[in-house]
């Protein structure tokens, strides 16, 4: 270290230290003194007259080094020639002043003090080791009680805590010398020194083996963990008590003189000053042999001063400065957003950057951006100076500077040259995914705004209403190469989130291409036949045919396919003109249709697959130009008459009003409850809104015209509003409905829907009341957006943190395990086809055609678009794929299990940081997810209230594990929960399958035939019925008015209903028994009623099987938490237990009800072999299974959401992953956001990395300990090799926050959350951070081990083979001539 300082000022800078890992541990007092450059004895800082540091003070030059470079404090030695000399007068070494940033001092304490992190960071480590509660420990340390350090021969225990009275009593009783005790940190230190860790560890392991109580075992395990940590790390427990304190280098806690003789100082100086003052006072008191009380008080104050220095506010009130705000302690310097980690180490401000407003640059090519000259001049300054010197315009930097300031013409020429092919990076905040920073080649422009290419707006989420963007300049050659190859906008055509193009024409461009490719009946030149596309163009340019005329053209579909014969194609003139922008590889059929936004996206996708990246970029740019041009020529505009209000609107509204009145009457008569009435009213209005919208859209989208034969035909309309929405350029059906239909139902800020809808639309105008209702929802939306952004950002941060070390580390892990992927269906409808789910994955085994048995896909082959088509054509329902979840790589993930890199369209490269990409892909759409999924107009709630099932196909009806009862009307009533109805065609192939709910009425008997569109089943969506399976006479049991049942009077209707209420008496179980109606009168059925059930029968009534005896109103059955949007995603990733989660069965078997115990229902599941299992279900919860039902493992026994931890325990990792992926996807699908499954799988993999040890066997693991899966496997492998008993463990699901905090790397965890806790634990364990993840490397200032920085590439060096000039020339001549476009690209 020495020569580093004294080395010449002009030497080349030394290489930075090379290190491969970093360790953290507790410093011993010797270590602290050894590292220190001297003791700070005085609290003084600077002499305020001379501004020189005081000797032995906090800024002492003798200890910390000189304040001026190469100059001692008294000025005897100045300048370089004396370097390394120590001045004999003031004792200051003559060296550069920067050592004041790195030299530590120390303070010797007069009495030991405890380190607050090890005391108060829960669980208290000192308390754990000594087995003292934190409260008692604090009493000892703050001099309120005594601790026994050596019990001697007395019956007192080691470490026992006694109050002062008891201590004096004990001294009287046993004699003063019989035992030793004390108070304060000194006593605690003696106790810690007396610990024999090895013996203690053995003793604790024995205790664990012997103890029977779970709580005791857990307590002992916690203590053992701390003991083992100290044993293995080589830290000594007494080091947690400090004898001397290190003092931070003065430049890191500066004191800056302000004008007016005042000083601005860092809070740390105040805190150090307090410590030194109290320490010196204590030394003096000890020398004077002051009374014990005074000394004790002073020691306590010293302890408090040191506590405040390390972590102010952790104990007691925070010490405040003169301005009443708490002082910032050492811990606060590290913590939180503005702490060292997040402010300075993870994110830094950079030079060579600028920012400005953006404007659109429609004439730019995709790889360009417009950079204002002013900005370019400033950014490229050093380059310009260099070039000016090279050219000989100037000789010195100073004159170059002058020249640039005067903006001489030569400067602009040089600037043009410097800028050429030097990419710049543009960034728009917030950067939510990697496409938020992209590289462009700058084009110099006048003005002060940056020009941005319109096609990259989607990726940046930018618009031109005043957004700003930042420009950054890559300097080194390496960074320029990376910028060009990896970040250029032309290399980021596909989105990493779903693999579809993200560079897609939008708005005007879409409208232009849409208008071009529409056909109009009766246009000029209709039905003409042309010999070639060129002829069409000539005719159009001469005005002989209209753009939208339908014509026949003789042409080849794909110009690239020479074997094809020309054919007559039906098309329009506009499509032929659009064909001119296509590359030769893309067939004409790709655009021979009306091109809306979706079709354009598909076109770019097809082009990327067929013609490659370069052609796609050219196509995108040409589409942009064509789109803008023809949108301009079309001159589409909208006026108020374009909003056509449907004629039947009033009739629909009147009918709805009548229906609502009808419902109101039913409610007044007491037939339905208030909740049901509300639900039905909302439903009626939602339906009516839909009807009006349907009629209006029908009117808008069609128009009747007369064709050339004089016949009337209906064609898609040319209404401007319709065209905008239909093409996907702007607006949606929802918005048009509000313009010309009716606004519909509105929501209150609480998310409830107001039951009076707004029947007017914007064209008619709103009344004051209607306007007021609207403002409600609108303001809520604005407030939500503001809050949402922060939440979304936080979710992304947690996701990145948990997944940052998921990197592609090997090509193939060789696993034999995978996931079975099938189409995603909901209610018999296929939501996502199997093809979309397997595209870009790698097959696990060979995939065979089920009929011909030929191999479609070989094992370990990537499934591309062609193979997907093969698999779909073969009609495969399920295929086994490799997945990230089953990847066996120890660190990171293998390329085969990950599959395709979605943004590049081929198998993922080594070193790709797939974890971060996954986190960004999930977090980026987060801002779009609404806080609560209330869709104005209740379209969301319509989906839930499905009341019947219609068959989609013709065929025979089959019941699949359905248990039914035929009721009095002769219908089959469903009595089981997870039954399904299937429709099979004549060959016996199943065409569709639906789940049917309990209590549904089946309209068609088993094996009966059904036509398409016929109703299969219907049910009441607003109540959950309780049905009887048998007929007989009703008897009530424990249904006592005022105890378990209340007759509730409805204020409005005056009618009463019998409702089951909660009772204080736990023995009472309200139930309805069905007695045999015959002579015997025995009980043949018994039904327990949950709280809130409404009784539908009277006592002694005779009923039939399938009748409803009670119903539970829907409000209470909505227990499945309807947390929508972001909170739901966060809840899933945090693996929280839902509020009322359902108890699930762990085994297959038959259900019986056992005796109730403690007011809980007992459900017994009896398997065919083995022991029955019992489950207790809290009373008042509705049990969804019935006596005698057969349940499978993992099925819920009651209402409620699933608990992911239960799924993992019962059904295993794959089922859990499937559940999490499907649930997260459901939230995003509601918002129309596409995310590939594999991103969610990557995160789930990170959540499942750890296992919990159940049995330790003969390994070194601890019971209940959470360890990484591979650590557990390695330990077991060792045990097997030595013939010992292995440990057993269960998989563990950690939420993303927990998982981030428990990563191997303590640096990464500390920079995430709970910094002090993480560092405390790491120091005790003497943890070594091997710097494997991204975050810890960024913090240490190294290249990240991903992308171009992975270890395999890090040590590559380029070297140029020597070649003569002639060889070089011949090689150049041999190179093929590049055409102009290739050179441009």
From Swiss-Prot:
Binding site for Zn(2+) 1: 72, 74, 87, 90
Keyword Oxidoreductase (UniProt): no
The keyword Iron belongs to this UniProt entry's keyword annotation: no
Enzyme nomenclature, EC number: 2.7.7.6
Residues annotated for Zn(2+) 2 binding in this entry: 813, 887, 894, 897
Alphabetized SUPFAM superfamilies for the sequence: beta and beta-prime subunits of DNA dependent RNA-polymerase
GO cellular component term of the entry, any: DNA-directed RNA polymerase complex
Reaction(s) this enzyme catalyzes, per UniProt: RNA(n) + a ribonucleoside 5'-triphosphate = RNA(n+1) + diphosphate
GO biological process: DNA-templated transcription
Cofactor info, note text: Binds 1 Mg(2+) ion per subunit. Binds 2 Zn(2+) ions per subunit.
Residues involved in Mg(2+) binding: 463, 465, 467
Cofactor(s) named in the record: Mg(2+); Zn(2+)
Keyword terms, alphabetized: DNA-directed RNA polymerase, Magnesium, Metal-binding, Nucleotidyltransferase, Transcription, Transferase, Zinc
GO molecular function, one term: zinc ion binding
Summary of subunit composition and partner proteins: The RNAP catalytic core consists of 2 alpha, 1 beta, 1 beta' and 1 omega subunit. When a sigma factor is associated with the core the holoenzyme is formed, which can initiate transcription.
Function: DNA-dependent RNA polymerase catalyzes the transcription of DNA into RNA using the four ribonucleoside triphosphates as substrates.
Similarity section: Belongs to the RNA polymerase beta' chain family.
Record's protein name: DNA-directed RNA polymerase subunit beta'
Native source organism of the sequence: Trichlorobacter lovleyi (strain ATCC BAA-1151 / DSM 17278 / SZ) (Geobacter lovleyi)
Organismal lineage: Bacteria, Pseudomonadati, Thermodesulfobacteriota, Desulfuromonadia, Geobacterales
Gene: rpoC
């Amino acid at each position: 270290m020495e020569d580093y300082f004294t080395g010449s000022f002009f030497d080349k800078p030394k290489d930075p230290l090379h290190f491969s890992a970093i360790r953290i541990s507790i410093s011993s007092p010797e270590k602290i003194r050894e590292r220190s450059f001297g003791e700070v004895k005085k609290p003084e800082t600077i002499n305020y007259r001379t501004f020189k540091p005081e000797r032995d003070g906090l800024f002492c030059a003798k200890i910390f080094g000189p304040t001026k470079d190469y100059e001692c404090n008294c000025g005897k030695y100045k300048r370089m020639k004396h370097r390394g000399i120590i001045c004999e007068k003031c004792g200051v070494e003559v060296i550069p002043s920067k050592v004041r940033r790195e030299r530590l001092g120390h303070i010797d304490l007069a009495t030991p003090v405890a380190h607050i992190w090890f005391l108060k960071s829960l669980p208290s480590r000192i308390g754990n080791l000594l087995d003292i509660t934190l409260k008692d420990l604090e009493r000892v340390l703050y001099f309120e009680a005594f601790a026994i350090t050596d019990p001697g021969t007395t019956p007192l225990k080691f470490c026992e805590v006694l109050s002062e009275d008891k201590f004096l009593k004990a001294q009287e009783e046993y004699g003063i010398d019989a035992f030793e005790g004390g108070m304060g940190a000194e006593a605690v230190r003696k106790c810690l020194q007396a610990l024999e860790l090895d013996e203690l560890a053995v003793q604790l392991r024995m205790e664990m083996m012997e103890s029977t109580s779970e709580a005791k075992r857990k307590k002992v395990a916690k203590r053992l963990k701390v003991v083992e940590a100290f044993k293995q790390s080589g830290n000594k427990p007494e080091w947690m008590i400090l004898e001397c304190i290190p003092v931070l280098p003065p430049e890191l806690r500066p004191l800056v003189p302000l004008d007016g003789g005042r000083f601005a100082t860092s809070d740390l100086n105040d805190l150090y000053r307090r410590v030194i003052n109290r320490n010196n006072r204590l030394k003096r008191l000890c020398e004077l042999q002051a009374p014990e009380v005074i000394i004790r008080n002073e020691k306590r104050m010293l302890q408090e001063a040191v506590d405040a220095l390390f972590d102010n506010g952790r104990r007691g009130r925070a010490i405040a400065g003169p301005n009443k705000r708490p002082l910032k302690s050492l811990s606060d310097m590290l913590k939180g957003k503005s702490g060292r980690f997040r402010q300075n180490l993870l994110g830094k401000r950079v030079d060579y950057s600028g920012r400005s407003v953006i404007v659109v640059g429609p004439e730019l090519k995709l790889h360009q951006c417009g950079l204002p000259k002013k900005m370019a001049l400033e950014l490229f300054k050093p380059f310009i100076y260099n070039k000016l010197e090279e050219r000989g315009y100037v000789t010195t930097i100073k004159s170059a500077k002058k020249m640039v300031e005067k903006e001489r013409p030569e400067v602009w020429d040089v600037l043009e040259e410097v800028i050429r092919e030097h990419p710049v990076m543009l960034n728009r905040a917030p950067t939510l995914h990697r496409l938020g920073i992209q590289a462009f080649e700058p084009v110099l422009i006048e003005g002060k705004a940056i020009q941005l290419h319109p096609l990259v707006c989607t990726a940046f989420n930018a618009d031109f209403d005043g957004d700003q963007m930042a420009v950054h300049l890559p300097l080194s050659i390496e960074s320029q190469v990376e910028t060009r190859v990896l970040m250029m906008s032309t290399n980021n055509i596909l989105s990493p989130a779903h693999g579809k193009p993200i560079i897609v024409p939008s708005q005007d461009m879409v409208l232009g291409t849409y208008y071009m490719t529409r056909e109009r009946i009766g246009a000029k030149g209709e039905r003409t036949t042309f010999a070639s596309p060129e002829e069409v163009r000539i005719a159009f340019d001469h005005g002989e045919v209209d753009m939208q005329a339908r014509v026949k053209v003789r042409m080849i579909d794909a110009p690239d396919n020479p074997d094809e014969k020309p054919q007559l194609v039906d098309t329009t003139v506009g499509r032929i003109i659009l064909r001119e922008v296509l590359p030769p590889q893309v067939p004409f059929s790709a655009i021979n249709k009306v091109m809306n936004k979706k079709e354009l996206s598909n076109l770019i996708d097809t082009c990327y697959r067929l013609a490659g990246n370069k052609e796609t970029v050219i196509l995108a740019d040409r589409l942009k130009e064509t789109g803008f041009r023809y949108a301009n020529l079309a001159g589409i505009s909208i006026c108020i008459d374009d909003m056509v209000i449907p004629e039947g609107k009033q009739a629909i509204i009147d009918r709805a009003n009548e229906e609502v009145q009808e419902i109101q009457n039913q409610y007044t008569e007491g037939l339905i409850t208030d909740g049901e009435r509300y639900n039905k009213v909302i439903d009626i209005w939602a339906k009516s809104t839909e009807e009006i919208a349907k009629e209006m859209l029908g009117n808008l989208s069609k128009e009747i015209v007369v064709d050339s034969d004089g016949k009337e035909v209906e064609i898609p309309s040319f209404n401007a509003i319709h065209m905008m929405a239909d093409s996907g350029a702007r607006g949606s059906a929802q918005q048009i409905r509000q313009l010309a239909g009716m606004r519909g139902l509105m929501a209150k800020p609480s998310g409830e829907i107001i039951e009076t809808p707004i029947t007017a639309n914007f064209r008619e105008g709103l009344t004051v009341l209607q306007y007021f209702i609207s403002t409600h929802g609108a303001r809520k939306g604005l407030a939500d957006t503001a809050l949402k952004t922060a939440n979304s950002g936080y979710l992304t941060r947690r996701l990145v943190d948990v997944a940052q070390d998921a990197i592609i580390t090997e090509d193939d892990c060789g696993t034999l395990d995978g996931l079975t992927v099938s189409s995603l269906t909901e209610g018999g409808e296929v939501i996502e086809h199997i093809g979309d789910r397997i595209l870009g994955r790698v097959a696990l085994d060979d995939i065979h055609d089920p009929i011909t048995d030929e191999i479609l896909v070989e094992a370990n082959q990537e499934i591309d678009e062609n193979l997907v088509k093969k698999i779909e054509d073969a009609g495969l329902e399920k295929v086994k794929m490799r997945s990230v979840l089953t990847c066996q790589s120890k660190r990171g993930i293998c390329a085969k299990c990950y599959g395709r890199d979605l943004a590049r369209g081929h198998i993922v490269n080594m070193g790709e940081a797939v974890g971060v990409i996954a986190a960004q892909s999930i977090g980026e759409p987060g801002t779009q997810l609404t806080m609560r999924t209330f869709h104005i107009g209740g379209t969301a709630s319509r989906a839930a209230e499905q009341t019947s099932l219609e068959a989609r196909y013709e065929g025979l009806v089959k019941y699949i594990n359905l248990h039914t009862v035929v009721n009095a009307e002769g219908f089959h009533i469903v009595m089981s929960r997870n039954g399904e109805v299937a429709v099979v065609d004549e060959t016996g192939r199943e065409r569709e399958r639906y789940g049917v709910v309990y209590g549904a009425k089946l309209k068609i008997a088993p094996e009966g035939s059904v036509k398409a569109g016929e109703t299969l089943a219907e049910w009441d969506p607003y109540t959950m019925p309780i049905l009887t399976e048998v007929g007989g006479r009703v008897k009530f049991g424990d249904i006592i008015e005022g105890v378990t049942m209340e007759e509730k009077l409805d204020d409005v209707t005056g009618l009463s209903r019998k409702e089951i209420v909660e009772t204080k008496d736990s023995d009472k179980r309200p139930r309805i028994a069905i007695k045999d109606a015959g002579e015997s009168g025995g009980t043949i059925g018994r039904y327990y009623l949950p709280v809130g059930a409404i009784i539908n029968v009277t006592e002694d009534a005779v009923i039939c099987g399938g009748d409803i005896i009670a119903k539970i109103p829907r409000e209470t059955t909505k227990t499945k938490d309807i947390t929508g949007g972001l909170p739901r995603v966060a809840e899933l990733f945090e693996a929280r237990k839902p509020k009322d989660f359902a108890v699930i069965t762990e085994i297959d078997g038959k259900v019986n009800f056992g005796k109730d115990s403690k007011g809980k229902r007992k459900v017994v599941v009896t398997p065919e072999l083995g022991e029955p299992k019992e489950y207790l279900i809290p009373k008042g919860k509705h049990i969804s299974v019935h006596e005698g039902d057969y349940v499978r493992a993992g099925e819920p026994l009651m209402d409620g959401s699933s608990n992911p931890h239960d799924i993992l325990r019962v059904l295993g990792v794959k089922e859990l992953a499937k559940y999490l992926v499907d649930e997260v996807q459901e939230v995003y699908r509601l918002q129309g956001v596409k995310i590939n499954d594999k991103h969610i799988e990557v995160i789930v993999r990170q959540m499942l990395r750890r296992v919990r040890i159940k049995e330790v066997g003969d390994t070194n693991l601890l019971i209940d300990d959470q360890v990484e899966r591979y650590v557990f496997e390695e330990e077991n492998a060792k045990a097997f090799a030595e013939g010992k008993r292995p440990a057993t463990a269960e998989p563990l699901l950690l939420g993303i926050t927990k998982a981030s905090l428990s990563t191997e790397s303590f640096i990464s965890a500390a920079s995430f959350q709970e910094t002090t806790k993480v560092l405390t634990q790491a120091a005790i364990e003497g943890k070594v951070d091997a710097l494997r993840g991204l975050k810890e490397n960024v913090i240490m200032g190294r290249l990240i081990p991903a992308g171009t920085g992975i270890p395999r590439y890090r040590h590559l060096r380029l070297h140029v083979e020597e070649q003569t000039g002639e060889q070089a020339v011949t090689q150049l001549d041999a190179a093929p001539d590049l055409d102009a476009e290739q050179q441009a690209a």
